[in-house]
């Protein structure tokens, strides 16, 4: 026992001595360590091993507990023996080396340094928080939405987009009150109004003297679409181009300026409201157009002057400039495309079409016109303002004849027919859900450019159309129309001679009336109508060819389609009529544009179309015919001829005016019905436009109602189209798409026809 105790005591003494030494060393080491720390980096600290011993000291504490027991055992006696061993301490030094092994524990020190690093790590965590701040920047993306909001402002012109919808209801209310709350809309725009006061528009006020035309105010509803006013800014420059001194168009510039400043199409809208006064002009003009139909011969004489008229920059130039200008600034049209999304805007695109018609008067513009078609959808709003000017042209019957001459010129520039096609497509779109399609339409516009190439082929068809008019009637007997399409190319050979014939075509027009009697035959054809239903199937078959075929051949057919477009425009009106008389009016304006597309003989038709805008005038004469056209049947007859040959469409237009005047018009409707079956054939050309068919769905639903109401529509001033804007149709469009799919039992066939029609458009 003693030995162990002695040894134990010795061990304790050694530990104590070592611990004392280590404590001293530790203090020095700490001093040195701190010195190194402050002086340099961590390189020196590692060499300092003293530090580890300081840490190793903890192990000694472990032993210290045993030390306490020994004290207990330390009897005074034992202590003396212990001291002697201390003398032996020399040997103990050897143990000190063993102490070095504890330095192995140094690792604990390194661990401390790591802890230091962790703190830096912690700092990074704080930076991470700053990133959370970045997420707020992410919120900034919502701000980008602001730019869209700006577009809505155009739509909303009012403080909030919601207002724009409210505005649509107001249009509905407007119909109830011919007084036209629309004038009130200008008050809303009053902020911009200051600009307007400068505009000469007050003169338009003078034009308003005819309160009856207040229905023309309907255009104001149309103006609602002005929201796309982005394109309008483009028009402003056009207005400047129009600077053609005479034009009050300067007035238009004010509207244009307004859009630029607030970007608020609303300001433009006020002008649209004022523009309704301009619509008033259109009504007066329409009466002259009516006269024109009575005297087709007269229009031919005008043809010669027409060329001169183009020189007169005052009328056509001003109008054309706007259309041309639109092309000049296609860039805006892209922005407009968003507006196109806006259903309201699409409708107006048709209004633009009328300007294209004017463009034809001067072939030069025609190229620009193509861009306008694209732009037209973007900036349908201005087109309405332009329409009033076209209307003014109608006031001078001679002017409308100028349009006919332009048609002749158009053959020189086939491009028109292609551009027109594009517009036609747009018109249908506006009528229906198209609003959505309108964007697609815009896409087509770009493809349209490629069509321009086709237009050259188109040239031949356009020219044939003139002289062909006579031949076309024979073609009509051959309802097969399909082969006839081929014939149209032969017609193309005549094209050039046809120009001189233009005058003769008017005489031909008289025979055309007999040809209408053939339409009466079409009623007999009605028995075949069952067969026609198969013909409809053929159209599908034909369509397959068209995909490949259509590219080359279509150009000529395209011209034919232009004429078909007339009938399509009519159909759209019927469609609108069923939904509400108001709809038909809006559509009718598009028809007006479509007629412009046919520009050839159509020039006359466009005026009739204008009549629809003002139910008062048109009701007496064409409105009824128009209504009949609304009945898909009427337009179909035209389409078949167009399908057969482009010429047929041409003469058919001139004929149309007389039919309008003549009571025979009722007869048309019956014959027309068989044609509806034919319409499917016409669709064959249209297939390329198939995208629009979606729009057609809306028409199917409406079309059925149209037939019964057509008569009512003429009498009713329902044109008050103010409702039209409401129809604007976004709601209608959603509903209509489903109806077409649902396909009412009876309507489906007609709906199918409507699809092809839209395609042409």
From Swiss-Prot:
Per its record, what are the GO molecular function terms? Answer: structural constituent of cell wall
Keyword list, A-Z: Cell wall, Cell wall biogenesis/degradation, Repeat, Secreted, Signal
Residue ranges of the sequence repeats are 63-77, 78-94, 95-111, 112-128, 129-145, 146-162, 163-179, 180-195, 196-212, 213-229, 230-246, 247-263, 264-280, 281-297, 298-314, 315-331, 332-347, 348-364, 365-381, 382-398, 399-415, 416-431, 432-448, 449-465, 466-481, 482-498, 499-515, 516-531, 532-548, 549-565, 566-582, 583-599, 600-616, 617-633, 634-650, 651-667, 668-684, 685-701, 702-718, 719-735
According to the record, the residues making up region (40 X 17 AA approximate tandem repeats of Y-S-P-P-[IV]-[KY]-P-P-P-x(1,2)-K-P-P-T-P-T) are 63-735
- Chief location category: secreted
Q: According to the record, what induces this protein's expression?
A: Under positive control of gibberellic acid.
Q: Where is this region: Disordered?
A: 111-761
Question: Is-annotated flag, keyword Signal?
Answer: yes
Q: Where is the composition biased (Pro residues)?
A: 111-750
| UniProt-recorded name of the protein | Proline-rich extensin-like protein EPR1
Q: Which species does this protein come from? A: Arabidopsis thaliana
